[in-house]
Amino acid sequence: MPAATVDHSQRICEVWACNLEEEMKRIRQVTRKFNYIAMDTEFPGVVARPIGEFRSNADYQYQLLRCNVDLLKIIQLGLTFMNEQGEYPPGTSTWQFNFKFNLTEDMYAQDSIELLTSSGIQFKKHEEEGIETMYFAELLMTSGVVLCEGVKWLSFHSGYDFGYLIKILSNSKLPDEEVDFFEILRLFFPIIYDVKYLMKSCKNLKGGLQEVAEQLELERIGPQHQAGSDSLLTGMAFFKMREMFFEDHIDDAKYCGHLYGLGSGSSYVQNGTGNAYEEEANKQQS
């Protein structure tokens, strides 16, 4: 099978509090042979903007991320497992974790919740059957998925995605300074390829995840704007791009560990393409 070709026998496993332990056991087995993990999250938008003086636009973007991740809760996490050739494990390839979220008590941006509701996210079920993030973090820490240099993470414009994961895993607010954020990031996720960052070297590729997938002629499985389907599409995009634009080899020195819109990945500061969070928010719309 060519890398990242759609096979409709692949299925996305829904994970709630009731089946979390069972599915994490399966993941511990899967990750031994399928060590490329494509990741996406769904979160409740942006509700705050930092005030004060900032050293640079890049500093402002990190502080914007930090204040919102600190205030808000993750709604979904999607993890898709693939091997070096872009092949999936037999049966389930993607796990969609649904976290506890209460529309009455938790903060959110109204437009984001409306989009997620229209995409099929069941907020009543999240309130009643959602996963507790602290327990999820305990299981994830011993899963062989994080803190492991043999695992390669694939993402798309993922500053906020990794921000929420770091918040969950460390059970604390994000660090005040971006440099400390990247230090923690490298500890939990030593190898990351952000597809949006890779696109800088791919002629004519542009836009959000869905637009990129269409340009690459990839077929989505599952509903758009849900973390499982988006993580699966992110993994497909990485392997298709690696084949088409990188001769099946990614230069780690140039691309590994960079997140689009943050740190050295903040090319928008120089080229004037605007606010990185607005692009991140638009990623959910596209």
UniProtKB/Swiss-Prot annotation:
E.C. number(s) listed in UniProt: 3.1.13.4
Subcellular location as annotated: Nucleus; Cytoplasm
Record's GO cellular component terms: CCR4-NOT complex; CCR4-NOT core complex; nucleus; P-body
GO BP term, pick one: miRNA-mediated gene silencing by mRNA destabilization
SUPFAM superfamilies linked: Ribonuclease H-like
Main localization, broad class: nucleus
Keywords tagged on the record: Cytoplasm, Exonuclease, Hydrolase, Magnesium, Metal-binding, Nuclease, Nucleus, Repressor, RNA-binding, RNA-mediated gene silencing, Transcription, Transcription regulation, Translation regulation
Superkingdom field: Eukaryota
Coiled coil ranges: none
Pfam family, one: CAF1
Catalytic activity from the UniProt record: Exonucleolytic cleavage of poly(A) to 5'-AMP
GO molecular function, one term: RNA binding
Cofactor requirement: Mn(2+); Mg(2+); Co(2+)
Binding-site positions, a divalent metal cation 2: D40, E42, D230
Cofactor annotation remark: Binds 2 divalent metal cations per subunit with RNAase activity being higher in presence of Mn(2+) than of Mg(2+) or Co(2+).
Annotated positions binding a divalent metal cation 1: D40, D161, E278
Family: Belongs to the CAF1 family.
Matching PANTHER family: CCR4-NOT TRANSCRIPTION COMPLEX SUBUNIT
Assembly notes: Component of the CCR4-NOT complex.
Role according to the record: Has 3'-5' poly(A) exoribonuclease activity for synthetic poly(A) RNA substrate. Catalytic component of the CCR4-NOT complex which is one of the major cellular mRNA deadenylases and is linked to various cellular processes including bulk mRNA degradation, miRNA-mediated repression, translational repression during translational initiation and general transcription regulation. During miRNA-mediated repression the complex also seems to act as translational repressor during translational initiation. Additional complex functions may be a consequence of its influence on mRNA expression.
Protein name: CCR4-NOT transcription complex subunit 7
Species for this entry: Danio rerio
Gene coding for it: cnot7
